[in-house]
UniProtKB/Swiss-Prot annotation:
It comes from Listeria innocua serovar 6a (strain ATCC BAA-680 / CLIP 11262). GO terms for biological process: cell division; cell wall organization; peptidoglycan biosynthetic process; regulation of cell shape. GO terms for molecular function: ATP binding; tetrahydrofolylpolyglutamate synthase activity; UDP-N-acetylmuramoylalanine-D-glutamate ligase activity. This is UDP-N-acetylmuramoylalanine--D-glutamate ligase. ATP binds at residues 119-125.
Amino acid sequence: MKKIEMYHHKKVLVLGLARSGVSAATIMHKLGAFVTVNDQKPFSENPEAQGLLEQGIKVICGSHPIELLDEGFELVIKNPGIPYNNPMIEKALKLKIPVITEVELAYQISEAPIVGITGTNGKTTTTTIIHHMLNAHKENSSLLAGNIGFPASAVAENATSDQYISMELSSFQLMGVQTFKPHISVITNIYEAHLDYHTDRSEYVQAKWHIQQNQTADDFLVINWDQEELKNLTKQTKAQVIPFSTTQRLEQGSYVQNGNIMFDDEVIGSRDSILLPGEHNLENILASVAVAKTLGVTNEEIMYVLETFKGVEHRTQFVVEWQGRKFYNDSKATNILATQSALKGFKNPVVLLAGGLDRGNSFDELLPFFKNVKSLIVFGETADKIGRVGKIAGIEVHYVDDVEAAVPVAYRESAPGDIILLSPACASWDQYRTFEVRGNAYMDAISELIEEVEK
């Protein structure tokens, strides 16, 4: 970790505990700052709070007292999930107190260069593939950070200059960056999402675009050339642009030609030998190849990863084949586009489990993708909205309380050869703490179903 002096004896407020807040508070304390942590949940729901108190860090739990900001803080580090229209954040900005997220701190202390990956969909899978490719190369090693793995600042604290940090970044994290500068930035794609957090689509796009705002001509921007919006934005960057495309041959960058994965004019390997299923994963693969080639990973090392990588948990994850039915867990599908992508990947009839937090979407965009859906099982706040679209498509719709209740209904409505797919098209927070918890609940329910039927 770089021993920076800029926070020594500075008063710092960390808003929100969770993993990133604990990491930021601990590191700031080590850097000599006077740290206060504030979380809305009570002490009884914050097991990390006691550990911070034992380090000598002040902790206030149970509410966000607005008067706390009158205590002369010189910096606020906010949890990414706290929106900028939160009264605490609005007051901090009014008082001209800088507000950052934990990834900014990670960059400031990191000795290792950062490969930062963002996008509406595919960023977790892309980050993971890049991580594996860099670790497959004898001269590189990678640490996984950000929304996947460990908090960015915790990873940066222990990273060395001969490593890379493969860092997944959300728009929530990027919106507040000031000096953050990855050596390589990746934007997988941009679609409409998180409009409950951002004021409009323009703000969302700009938050994603912040990933490259401090890059120079010595840095690289890997970007989806199939999206005109992103293509046009590249005119504004100082970084070297490396495009990727699933639809066209490129003079430089990564693309597909004659069944082969290409980079510039070089054949990397056959697409048929790639283990990861689904058309939607091709973007992720091409973006990863562009990063790997830029950092000197060989074709053999790249293909070894692509021939062995089975995917990431909760992302179109194959769970089990039982009684002729294949169960898939796509709990990470927290928006409509992700569910569209999942449905496109299956040719067999699908029993779809969907629903979750209501962010104001109509779900009409799912209609063209329901051709292979034979039965729809809905739950959560959006059950009625998604169910309405299913009825328009002429699909039989079943309403249940939650994911656990959906599994036996899905089995009853399916037949040998069918796909049973959890792909909610919604965030989990109306019923489950995270999409991982929701996905695990689904897989546990499958295990219970099998045990019950086979008694």
